[in-house]
């Protein structure tokens, strides 16, 4: 059992896929934080008017993280009105990559601890909320 887990946890790609699968059921709940709709509207206005603003072409920013607005605008350009699920999957994967980097710092020599840390960290309720409900915290 230990050798199987070591093989799985030593492969970063498989570990990130596992964390993405853990978060996948949350996408079917369609539970989105209401603040994310503000950011997504600002991103839509950036795509439509070239302005980071809430009310059309008016230059009043309503976003807290401009990087997330730019990423959301990119996803809206690529996927159109169906951008939400790919954006949330991307956010969850970025969070998993970040937790993997943190695990490599905390547990540089122990692959099992590193793997369990990444999987368990990505299962915590605040982590699920941060990376699967539309807010920029996953990024």
Regions found by a protein language model. Give the residues of each.
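Transmembrane signal-anchor helices characteristic of membrane glycosylation enzymes that use polyprenol
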Residues: 8-34, 123-125
């Amino acid at each position: 059992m230990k050798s199987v887990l070591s093989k799985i946890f030593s492969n970063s790609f498989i570990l990130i896929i596992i964390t993405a699968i853990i978060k996948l059921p949350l996408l079917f709940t369609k539970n989105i934080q209401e603040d994310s709709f503000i950011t997504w509207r600002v991103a839509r206005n950036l795509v439509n008017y070239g302005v980071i603003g809430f009310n059309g072409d008016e230059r009043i920013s309503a976003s807290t993280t401009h990087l997330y607005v730019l990423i959301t605008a990119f996803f809206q350009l690529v996927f159109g009105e169906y951008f939400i699920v790919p954006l949330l999957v991307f956010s969850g994967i970025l969070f998993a990559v970040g937790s993997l980097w943190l695990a490599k710092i905390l547990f540089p020599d122990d692959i099992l601890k590193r793997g369990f840390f990444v999987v368990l960290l990505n299962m915590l309720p605040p982590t699920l909320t941060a990376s699967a409900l539309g807010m920029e915290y996953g990024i």
